[in-house]
Every structure is written in C-alpha cells, then in structure tokens.
C-alpha cells in the first residue's frame, strides 16, 4: 500500500507533513509519491526536514512520475534539493495516462496487449520501477486534453486485467525482472 494525499497551498506545513509521514510509516510504504501543488511539508523548513529525515531513515524512495511525453519526470519546487539530500534515492514511475488507458483492442489486438506493450517498454527501455495502474478505458472514449473524464467508461471484466498483468510478468521474467 502506497498512501497518497494531495497537497494544497496554505495547508502544507509541519503538522500536515508529520501526519502524512505517520501514515507512510504505518503502511511501511516502499516509496513516497507526491501529489498536488507542492512537496509535502514544503511550506515550512521543519516540514521539509521531516520528509527528508523520513526518506533517509526509512529507506523509502522518492517516486518520480514520468511525464506523458516520456522525456522527463514531473517535479515540484524542491524536488531536486530533496533528491540531493537523500543521495538520489529515487525511482521512476510510469503513469498510465488516458491515451494509454485507451489502448484496449488497439493496433489490431483484441484485448489489453498494447497496454501491456506500453508497460513493458516503460520498464525495460526507460527504467520505470513502478507502474501506476489505472482502469482500462473502453475503446471509444475521448481522451483529448480537454475531455470530460467523468464521461469515461471502463472495462470491468477482471479477466482483461489478469491477462495484462500475467502477460507482462511472462515477458519480464526471462529478463530477470520480478
């Protein structure tokens, strides 16, 4: 379990950092994945130090989410400084963006094969260590940048997800990935 929260300006000081870090500790989270306007605790020196100390002492990594163009990672003010202070103990996360979620029955396939291909390339070619798995979209959804995500419809058959994960495992295992 990797707990996530969303930071908001004006509500992200020492108390918030302390409370969130307690949740990370409770679940022994292997990594910290930020979400929101700024890094956890960023509004106070003490809050920033609490996050740094937690990452150093727990051995948890800082999760860096890959941008949708796959060129860099999404960062917040203070990310580079945080990575420096924890000796670059970070991992790259592949986010299953809407256009990837929408690749069911795509390119001549009849199921999630192209989504599996995207996961495989992220792991093998771009060194992503975590896949941020999301629901698979039905093929006819509008995933343009201004699409209304509340209108999206999803594949709900568990067999599609099982196939996707088992096929990925089968492709990665001979290469030494577990």
Predicted regions: what they are:
Residues 1-178:
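Soluble extramembrane regions of membrane proteins in the secretory/endomembrane system
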